[in-house]
Amino acid sequence: MSFMREFKEFAMRGNVIDLAVGVIIGAAFGKIVDSLVKDIVMPVIGRLLGGVDFRHLYINLGDQTYETMEAAEKAGAPLVKYGQFINTTIDFLIIAFAIFVAVKAINRLKRSEPPPPPAPVEAEEVKLLREIRDTLKRG
């Protein structure tokens, strides 16, 4: 079998195509969540906390002081951008929650397979008769 034919069979399997669609939808969903956090959630939280813009919260590890994070970045100062970390953490939590809800819904929609029937229980009389038979065969 040629390399190209093997690759075509691999690529056309349902699982590979499903995975590709999932990756594309996941990337688009990530952008939506990023916008939700940066443009809707964090401004509301910032407003409730006194007008804080989390994107611009940082700790300057350098010796000089700067008026803005952008000025410190431009000067090459070492920064701990904990505000962006907070945004990214909230992104993750929203995505994780959405995936949890989706998986839970999918599992609920799947029909669970009925459990296998229990093995038939042998009556004591049948066991006793088998033992007698086996003993008679031996002796």
From Swiss-Prot:
Taxonomic source organism: Aromatoleum aromaticum (strain DSM 19018 / LMG 30748 / EbN1)
Subcellular location: Cell inner membrane
A GO cellular component annotation in the UniProt record: plasma membrane
Keyword Metal-binding tagged: no
TM segment ranges: 16-36, 83-103
Any Pfam family: MscL
Protein name: Large-conductance mechanosensitive channel
Protein's job: Channel that opens in response to stretch forces in the membrane lipid bilayer. May participate in the regulation of osmotic pressure changes within the cell.
InterPro entries, per the entry: Mechanosensitive_channel_CS, MS_channel, MSC/AndL, MscL_channel
Protein's UniProt keywords contain Ion transport: yes
